[in-house]
Curated annotation (Swiss-Prot):
One Pfam entry name: MarR
Binding site for FMN: T188, E196
Coiled coil: none
Binding positions for Mg(2+) per the UniProt entry: T131, N133
Region entry H-T-H motif-like, spans: 1-92
Full protein name: Riboflavin kinase
Lineage start: Archaea, Methanobacteriati, Methanobacteriota, Stenosarchaea group, Methanomicrobia
Source organism: Methanospirillum hungatei JF-1 (strain ATCC 27890 / DSM 864 / NBRC 100397 / JF-1)
InterPro entries: HTH_MarR-typ, RibK_CTP-dep, Riboflavin_kinase_archaeal, Riboflavin_kinase_CTP-dep, Riboflavin_kinase_dom_sf, WH-like_DNA-bd_sf, WH_DNA-bd_sf
Function in brief: Catalyzes the CTP-dependent phosphorylation of riboflavin (vitamin B2) to form flavin mononucleotide (FMN).
Start and end residues of each stretch annotated as Riboflavin kinase: 93-221
């Protein structure tokens, strides 16, 4: 598990631009910014590298450091934790609906690694192999139209074994304090009263849900 000291160091590298491109740094300057000695800063970098959170290229007068996908995931998880603490103070949209059975296709698509990897980066979790299908109550369908103004993320499609898999739009949400994501396959015309949700665990089992049970989806706009 990443330590608070390692996470602070990782965040500093990200703020320097290490999420997108390699950044040049010296342990003495990094330590000064973090309140560490150069020796401690060097240990933090070695620890981050050993955990797979950064990659480094050492030089004679410093080093090039890049944050890996694993490091980005660690930062996203930290963001999700703070979002759960403070983000709910923002304007939220509550959508009420009832659980219903789907076609069982969600388990297959969530098991595809290119999709799963992107959901991990966007939502901060690897999706459970399956989705929760929800039919909105009559009063919630008007509320759903407001989702068009939300900041949807796009999970890129891909090709595999001669088959093309399309883009998927994704919107972070919560169901009973569990971070989830509303998904809309790009090639599918969903009825407005239907919502499909991915989550880090099986919500039916977690909350003992059965068809017809009412649930609330919370989306921060």
């Amino acid at each position: 598990m990443v330590t608070p000291e390692d996470l602070e160091c990782l965040k500093r590298i990200a703020l320097m631009g290490g999420l997108n491109t390699p950044v040049f740094l010296k342990t003495i300057s990094l330590g000064s910014e973090l309140g560490f000695s150069p020796q401690t800063a060097s240990r933090r970098l070695r620890s981050l590298e050993q955990q797979g959170f950064i990659s480094r290229t050492l030089g004679t007068d410093g080093q090039q450091v890049t944050i890996t996908h694993g490091g980005e995931d660690a930062l996203r998880q930290e963001y999700c934790d703070y979002y759960r603490l403070f983000g709910r103070q923002e304007k939220s949209l509550m959508l009420n609906g009832t659980v219903q059975s789907g076609l069982g296709e969600g388990a297959y698509y969530m098991s595809l690694q290119p999709y799963a990897d992107q959901f991990q980066r966007i939502l901060g979790f690897t999706p459970f192999p399956g989705t929760l299908n929800i039919r909105l109550l009559p009063g919630a369908t008007l509320q759903r139209k407001r989702l068009s103004s939300a900041e949807w993320k796009v999970v890129q499609g891909f090709e595999s074994e001669g088959r093309t898999f399309g883009d998927v739009r994704c919107l972070p949400c919560f169901i009973r304090d569990v971070p989830c994501g509303i998904i809309i396959p790009g090639r599918t015309h969903y009825p407005e009263e239907l919502i499909e949700v991915v989550s880090p665990e099986g919500l039916r089992k977690r909350f003992s849900l059965k068809d017809g049970d009412e649930v609330t989806i919370e989306v921060t706009l």
